[in-house]
Amino acid sequence: MDLTADLERFAAIPRTLPAIEPAIRSLARFIAVVAAAPSMALDRLAADGVMAFDRFRRPLTAHERGQRLGAGLSQRQIENLDRWGYPYVFEDFRFHLTLTGPIDADRRGSVLALLQARFDAIDGAHSLPITRLSLLRQDAWSTPFRVVGQAALTAVRSPQ
């Protein structure tokens, strides 16, 4: 079982490469980049990834499962948690790139406005093509992720 080799094989499968219109939004206590509109290509890529890499996933501990169950999950999300180790996959997947840690409610609006203004000022920030996958590792819940591998996605060739 070689995760890096599987990442490269997965990325080499020709597919429609997703592109999203990014937007800065508040997600619960965090602020994140999200897709302004649904992307079937991105949803398919995410679903394919969940299934392709599930064999590398560490099973949830009873404590981790209990914490997730306390979040008010739907029946489908509980089934996803038990089968895939995470409740927000497939129909419940929502693309996001978290920009902040938790922000108190009284500050969240002003931080959101600031980040939206900064983001809007970036030239070319209104289309975000997804062309690479990164393999990240987090050694402990409280530590940052670090990149341990990357692979370029392979686009479906247009008929000539």
Language-model segments: what does each one mean?
Residues 1-160:
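Histidine-dependent nucleotide/RNA phosphoesterase domain, centered on the 2H-phosphoesterase fold
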